[in-house]
C-alpha cells in the first residue's frame, strides 16, 4: 500500500456543464446549500491543522467545477503558500479558465488537468449536455491559455464512452506528439450513471493502447505520475499518454489518496463508503483539532482494508451518488 499523502478537495458540487458520465440527464441533483459548504476558513483550518500534520502533502482542487468557487484564486494562493504543500493541482472543465489562467499560476498553481472528451465540437457539446450552446471553442481557448502561461504538466482528461467518442482515440492521442501535453484516457465507470453505463459499457485501456500501438508504436514513458495512470509514450513525442483503468485493471493497492467533499465529508475510497467522516459537522460542533486529527489518523490506518473490500466494486457496484457529488 502506498503512503497516503494526496487529498482531493472538492470546492463546490455545482458545475456549468452536465457531462453524461458525471451528472447524467434525468438524475435529480440536490445541490449543497451555500451554508453547508465548507467556508474558506474551515477548509484552510482542516488543511493546515488536520491534514498536513497527519502527512498529507499533495492537494488537488476539484468540483463540480472548482472555478465556480468564489475567490478561488485567493484559496489557491493560501494553500500554495503553506510551506508543507509539496504539490498543488486542479482539475477543471476549462470553460472559465482562459481569463484567470495567469492569476492561478501567479497564485502558486503549477499543474492542471482539463477535461477534453472530444475534438469534435458537436460531440463535445453532446457529452457535456450544452443544449445547443456551443462550448468547445471556449474550452480549447482555456487549454491554449494554460499552455501559454506555462502549466507543466498540462494534462487532458478523456473519458472514453463507447459509441460516442471512442472513434477519436488516435486524434486525441496525437495531441501528445508536438506539445508536452499529457493525454489521459479514463475508462467509463458506473458511478451515478447506471442507465447510461448499462447501455454502453466500457472500452478497456488495453484495447486503446493497441489502437495507438498499431498506428505509431508505444513505449513505456520515463516519467511516472503520482496517481493511478499507467504512462506510455508515442516514440518521439514530447508528451505522454496515460491510461486509468479502474474497470479492467484494479489499482487499489497503489491508491495514495482520500477525498474531501465540498460539504466536508472525508472519504477514504471512491468505491466504498465505509469509514467516511463528517469533518464539517465535527468542526462546527466544537470537536477539537486534536480529536479530528486522531479520527483521520485512524481512517488512514484502516484504509487498506477499506480499499480491499471495494476493489471489485468497479465492475459490479451500483452507485446512487454522482461523480460531481463525490468530488471526482
UniProtKB/Swiss-Prot annotation:
Gene3D superfamilies: Aldolase class I. Pfam families: Fer4_12, Mob_synth_C, Radical_SAM. It comes from the Bacteria. Monomer and homodimer. This is GTP 3',8-cyclase. The gene is moaA. Its cofactor is [4Fe-4S] cluster. SUPFAM superfamilies: Radical SAM enzymes. [4Fe-4S] cluster 1 binds at residues 15, 19, 22. HAMAP family: MoaA_B.
Amino acid at each position: 500500500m502506498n503512503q497516503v499523502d494526496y487529498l482531493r478537495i472538492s470546492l463546490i458540487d455545482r458545475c456549468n456543464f452536465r457531462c453524461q458520465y458525471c451528472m447524467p440527464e434525468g438524475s435529480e441533483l440536490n445541490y449543497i446549500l451555500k451554508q453547508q459548504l465548507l467556508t474558506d476558513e474551515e477548509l484552510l483550518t482542516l488543511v493546515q491543522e488536520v491534514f498536513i500534520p497527519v502527512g498529507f502533502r499533495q492537494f488537488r482542487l476539484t468540483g463540480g467545477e472548482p472555478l465556480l468557487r468564489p475567490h478561488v484564486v485567493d484559496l489557491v494562493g493560501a494553500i500554495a503558500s503553506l510551506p508543507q504543500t509539496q504539490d498543488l493541482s486542479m482539475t477543471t472543465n476549462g470553460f472559465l479558465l482562459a481569463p484567470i489562467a495567469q492569476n492561478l499560476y501567479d497564485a502558486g498553481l503549477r499543474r492542471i488537468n482539463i477535461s477534453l472528451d472530444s475534438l469534435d465540437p458537436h460531440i463535445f457539446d453532446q457529452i457535456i449536455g450544452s443544449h445547443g450552446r456551443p462550448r468547445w471553442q471556449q474550452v480549447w481557448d482555456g487549454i491554449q491559455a494554460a499552455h501559454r502561461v506555462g502549466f507543466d504538466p498540462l494534462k487532458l482528461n478523456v473519458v472514453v464512452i463507447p459509441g460516442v467518442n471512442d472513434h477519436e482515440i488516435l486524434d486525441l492521442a496525437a495531441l501528445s506528439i508536438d506539445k508536452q501535453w499529457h493525454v489521459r484516457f479514463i475508462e467509463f465507470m458506473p458511478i451515478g450513471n447506471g442507465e447510461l453505463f448499462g447501455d454502453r459499457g466500457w472500452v478497456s485501456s488495453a484495447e486503446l493502447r493497441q489502437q495507438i500501438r498499431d498506428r505509431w508504436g508505444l513505449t513505456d514513458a520515463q516519467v511516472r505520475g503520482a496517481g493511478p495512470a499507467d504512462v506510455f509514450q508515442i516514440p518521439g513525442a514530447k508528451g505522454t499518454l496515460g491510461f486509468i483503468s479502474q474497470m479492467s485493471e484494479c489499482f487499489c493497492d497503489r491508491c495514495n489518496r482520500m477525498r474531501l467533499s465540498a460539504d466536508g465529508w472525508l472519504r477514504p475510497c471512491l468505491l466504498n463508503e465505509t469509514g467516511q467522516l463528517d469533518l464539517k459537522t465535527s468542526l462546527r460542533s466544537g470537536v477539537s483539532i486534536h480529536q479530528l486529527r486522531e479520527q483521520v489518523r485512524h481512517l488512514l490506518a484502516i484504509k487498506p482494508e477499506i480499499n480491499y473490500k471495494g476493489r471489485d466494486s468497479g465492475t459490479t457496484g451500483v452507485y446512487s451518488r454522482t461523480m460531481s457529488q463525490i468530488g471526482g
